């Protein structure tokens, strides 16, 4: 499935403020280094209590905890909802944009699938 290329890559807002971190082991932390969840190498998405809250399939399909498809992450970085409406894009340089190409933030060095899960599917927004 994906991985952060370097331990502790920053997730940043569009004004470069740090909003969190994605570690190479899949741990997702907020800006205060509190663990908010995990993305496992098998695609399982877990909250901070290790409860499974979703799945990333090898083909880029994103599912909720009940295996309902909620979106897709295409190989080119396009992110779509379950109805194939474009939500945004994760560019190869880590820039994350909405469907109108406005920059939402940055996830440089973070696998685009993981970045899409954090920015578009809100698994870790409590």
Model regions and ranges:
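Long terminal segments
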Residues: 2-35, 41-43, 51, 58-60, ...
């Amino acid at each position: 499935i994906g991985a952060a290329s370097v331990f502790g890559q920053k997730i940043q807002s569009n004004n470069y403020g740090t909003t969190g971190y994605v570690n190479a082991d899949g741990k997702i932390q907020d800006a205060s280094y509190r663990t908010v969840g995990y993305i496992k190498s098998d695609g399982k998405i877990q909250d901070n209590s290790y409860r499974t809250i979703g799945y990333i399939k090898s083909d880029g399909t994103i599912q909720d905890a009940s295996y309902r498809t909620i979106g897709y992450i295409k190989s080119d970085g396009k992110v779509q909802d379950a109805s194939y409406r474009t939500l945004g894009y994760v560019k190869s340089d880590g820039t994350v944009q909405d469907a109108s190409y406005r920059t939402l933030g940055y996830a440089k060095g973070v696998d685009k699938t993981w970045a899409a899960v954090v920015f578009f599917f809100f698994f870790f927004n409590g």
